[in-house]
Amino acid sequence: MAVQAALLSSHPFIPFGFGGSADGLVSAFGSLDKGCCFEDDESGASAGALLSGSEGGDVREATRDLLSFIDSASSNIKLALDKPGKSKRKVNHRKYLQKQIKRCSGLMGTAPPRPASPSAADAPAKRPPGAPTVATPAHCKAAPRREATQAAAAASLQSRSLAALFDSLRHIPGGAETAGGAEAVSVPGLGAASAVGDGAGTAVSSVAPGTRKVPLRARNLPPSFFTEPSRVGCGGASGVPSGQGVSLGDLEKGAEAVEFFELLAPDFGSGNDSGVLMAADPLDPFPAGATVLRGPLELESGPFEQPAMVGNLLYPEPWNTPSCPQTKKPPVAGVRGGVTLNEPVRLLYPTALDSPGGEDAPALSSFTPFFPDCALPPPHQVSYDYSAGYSRAVYPSLWRPDGVWEGASGEEGGHPD
């Protein structure tokens, strides 16, 4: 780039100190501007012939040196671009990330617990002996003691800030705080469990600070997670008095519990009688409205008998005609809905006996009776004319009043009259 910036004349080879005047060189190189590369071919031979007049030997040497310099420079630049030099610092990114993850997880697990009492609040937080120290790269040299103390102070400050952050997120507004941010959930209706509520919370909070698993009491869980529903005849072990009404308001205390049960259903109240769960009440599979529809057992029909209430709702059957004798049990005294078992079943569709025409409904009486002891009425007789030829009812215009056939004389099928 610097060479191109220094070229101010019309031809690139003039400022390199060739012998002779510039005009002579311009005239000599004038024909070489059109794509000449000065290689050992016919173009190079023609260039040598052009330069033979004015100091051809010196110009050829200078041109050859210039071309070799350009070639070597371009090759060096190409090699430098293709093959970069080795980096002075080698970084194993996988190992570095693993160390960073281990360091962060160690800081999260070794969060200093909160003091259990106000008197112990002034005690300084100590790092546990098993806690991992600040991870340093393996290839680095040992840092001085001053830098090590500064790094330890920064790590402790960071761990304290992280612990304060997560303890504030774990805080529940309605619960009582204990050591380590854990809350002691005390249930008033649990008898012996309520007496040791504070002791259980303190025991749960006294978890080793080096452990990374957060106890259940320290998590943001509803108090109903730690209670069991009471059953009839099974209690004592959990401390729940069996056979007594335990209200949801006694089991759940706090604003978050009220909101939780308001989301479930409006009937679950915390202080009213609608939220009382009675363990002694059995679950009724039928609602209250279904008990009204159920009648006494003696009025219900047998398994193979027709119900009394749906007599006119069933489809008519050929054996349900009035001529069929009644073979059912004697009915029970009492009228339900104005229909008794003494009254014969009214058919929804009229049969051949009730139809006015009598010719359109012989189909219902053509079935084979299901009960052999039930006599069926005789089927309606339909008159048919089986005489040869056309009947008089179908073609009345072909017959005279005296019964003489008016068709062609030689036509077959004429009436024998």
Curated annotation (Swiss-Prot):
Any Pfam family the entry gives: TEADIR3
Annotated segments matching region Disordered: 104-147
Domain of life per record: Eukaryota
Transmembrane stretches, start-end: none
Family to which the UniProt record says this protein belongs: Belongs to the FAM181 family.
Protein's recorded name: Protein FAM181B
Organism: Mus musculus
